[in-house]
Amino acid sequence: MVDAIVATFADDALVNDAHREFWGIEAIRRWAARELAGDRVTIAVTEVLDHHGDTIVRGRYDGNYDKTNLPDELILTNYFSIRDGKIVTLMVIRNTPASY
């Protein structure tokens, strides 16, 4: 599973997940092994949008990760930038609705 995930990223890609940066393919491999495969994360996609060539994917996350202070239904937004068929940037963000 980890090899398949990592194969979608460029060698110098950036992942930002929970305000942490993972630069380069080896850091992304460690992130995917520990936090996706290791925590058995599943994502049920709820929305996919194209925004000026970038892809935005919203989904319900579940898995064996620490859910302390998280809502029962965790929706995260994933912002993908893709160049030459590879992910160059992935930002994983827990958004909240604007109050105005």
Label each PLM-derived region with a short phrase.
Residues 4, 27-30:
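Alpha-helical elements of Rossmann-like donor-binding domains used by nucleotide-donor carbohydrate transfer enzymes
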Residues 1-12:
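Short, well-ordered alpha-helical segments enriched in acidic and aromatic residues
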Residues 29-100:
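A beta-strand edge to alpha-helix "cap/lid" segment located at domain peripheries
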Residues 12-23, 34:
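A short gly/proline-enriched turn/hairpin at secondary-structure junctions
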